[in-house]
UniProtKB/Swiss-Prot annotation:
Residues 33-60, 187-212 are annotated as: Disordered. It is found in: Chromosome, Centromere, Kinetochore. GO terms for cellular component: kinetochore. Residues 192-210 have a biased composition (Acidic residues). The keyword Coiled coil applies. Keywords: Acetylation, Centromere, Chromosome, Coiled coil, Kinetochore. The gene is GPATCH11. The modification N6-acetyllysine is found at K123. This is G patch domain-containing protein 11.
Length: 260
């Protein structure tokens, strides 16, 4: 029978645990140390000023300090009567502070920045001109559209007034037993010819319509005058008056504008 192990013996009690870090722990430590070194290096760089910054600071410091008597040029000015802080010029109204020094640090040639600025201004001015011209063109197009629309509306109104005059003329002529209009266009032309109409009559009507050279406005003016003279009627008033005196007294005039 095998001997049982004694868990209270020294072989178990005095065993020391192996607490050495494994591979993952070593990686974490190295990564943390590397980050700390980078942080310290970045802080050091931030604390150190560049050569250009140091030159700029020394230059600004020198320009801020006034020249002392030890300066030969300033001593010569004092002998000529100049006092520290006095304005330049005979009348004493010149500048007091020295002209600021603008040090060029870029690699571009002299006048390059001025050229770029002028080109940018020219480009901006060209853009503004294009916008202005485009705006003017849009305004002209809108105005022309309004004019065309108004002309179209005016034309449609004239055509409507002419049809009303032709319809009224046909009714009033018929009431006076006038069988044939004074002019063919005084009456509304039927949209469809009757079957009894001969081919000769059709050709005659077509010739009459083709030979018309009067505009809608001219036809309306002529027909309006006929209705007023022959029937004492005004299409805009919609009234047949008793006599010429009644017509002239109560009708505003022979045009549509007179009735607005």
């Amino acid at each position: 029978m095998a001997e049982e192990e004694d868990y209270m013996s020294d072989s178990f009690i005095n065993v020391q645990e192996d607490i050495r870090p494994g591979l993952p722990m070593l990686r974490q430590i190295r990564e943390a140390r590397r980050k700390e070194e980078k942080r310290q290096e970045a802080n050091l760089k931030n604390r150190q000023k560049s050569i250009k910054e140091e030159e700029q600071e020394r230059r600004d410091m020198g320009l801020k300090n006034a020249l002392g008597c030890e300066n030969k040029g300033f001593a010569l000015l004092q002998k000529m009567g100049y006092k520290s802080g006095q304005a330049l010029g005979k009348s004493g109204d010149g500048i007091v502070e020295p002209i600021p020094l603008n040090v060029k640090t870029g690699k571009s040639g002299i006048g390059h920045e001025t050229l770029l600025k002028r080109k940018a201004e020219e480009k901006l001015e060209s853009y503004r001109r294009k916008i202005h011209m485009k705006s003017q063109a849009e305004e002209r197009a809108a105005e022309q559209f309004r004019i065309r629309l108004k002309n179209k509306q005016d034309e449609m109104k004239l055509e409507g007034d002419l049809r009303r005059s032709q319809r009224a003329c046909q009714q009033l002529d018929t009431q006076k037993n006038i069988q044939v209009p004074r002019e063919a266009w005084y009456w509304l032309r039927p949209e469809e010819e009757t079957e009894e109409e001969t081919e000769e009559e059709k050709e005659q009507d077509e010739d009459e319509y083709k030979s018309e050279d009067l505009s809608v406005l001219e036809k309306l003016q002529i027909l309006t005058s006929y209705l007023r003279e022959e029937h004492l009627y005004c299409i805009w008033c919609g009234t047949a008056y008793e006599d010429k005196e009644d017509l002239s007294s109560n009708c505003p005039g022979p045009t549509s504008a007179d009735h607005d």
